[in-house]
Curated annotation (Swiss-Prot):
Transit peptide, residues from-to: 1-28
Stretches that traverse the bilayer: none
Major enzyme class: lyase
NCBIfam families associated with the record: yjeF_cterm
Modified residues (N6-acetyllysine): 49
The species this protein was found in: Bos taurus (Bovine)
InterPro entries listed in its UniProt record: CARKD, Ribokinase-like
Localisation per UniProt entry: Mitochondrion
Cellular component GO terms held in the UniProt record: mitochondrion
Cofactor(s) needed: Mg(2+)
Protein name: ATP-dependent (S)-NAD(P)H-hydrate dehydratase
Amino acid sequence: MALGPGCRAVRGCRPVLKRAFSLHKAHSVKDMESILQLVRSVVPALTTKKHKGQDGRIGVVGGCREYTGAPYFAAISALKVGADLSHVFCTQEAAPVIKAYSPELIVHPVLDSPEAVRDVEQWLPRLHALVVGPGLGRDDALLENVKGILEASKARGIPVVIDADGLWLIAQQPALIQGYRKAVLTPNHVEFGRLSEAVLGVPLDGGDRHGAVLRLSQALGNVTVVQKGEQDVISDGEQVLECSQEGSGRRCGGQGDLLSGSLGVLAHWALRAGPQKTGGPSPLLVAAFGACALTRQCSQQAFQKYGRATTTSDMVAEVGPAFRRLFEA
């Protein structure tokens, strides 16, 4: 990414790359507010004229014997952000556990079935977005089924958020989402390094996170990439955003699932609203920024109450208040 003279040393300095801009670590409140305003513009109004399902039917693909919390956190977060219906497509062993967590989720025990792809594919016409990977695990048979589900989702043009072991699959087979611009990858530091090695053949450049995320997105054909970290760096290969909404120092497991579930809903809303509402940034960039800001705000609010004892369940309880504070105040 080309920068103006001395740009790296100047707070709030913007790159000169065409159509790209970056909100740096010490970006102005005005810049943050302008992006948050774009997120607000895609949030649908709650009215009595709507019917169930119009504001989002989200599917989460993941959940196995070892990992039942992750798909629950993603699916329940989608509901709390504002989706009307939230489905979980998991293994047979995981289903009773996830059902027991919440009666509000629609749980399908099909992911380890020989007919898993067909079973999930029949639901795709009813879904607005998929979140793939929370609690998936790395069983070869499950990954093969998820590969088929991804191909079917792409064929229907369904937005796909990929996290956790879904990213492991992409690192093994990047062609699965190459050029699919309705995909969003949400890697943490380790997952991003693995993707960078697999796609670019180079180790992670920790000194230039903005450039690293931009290059990975471009190499994948402008798939949106969210590198989670002290600040979240987001790029669609053309633009780069940085979200440094205040969060907390607590790093309990499950926060990424809250982000991915939230992002599934926001992606649907942003794509439905279209670029005329999101202005310069693409709809998925705006959605990703919104999900990052919301997750950080939930973390901050939960930490203020529980401090070191904060868990992701505490953060999920803050989704409603945090959403109102950021997007409906």
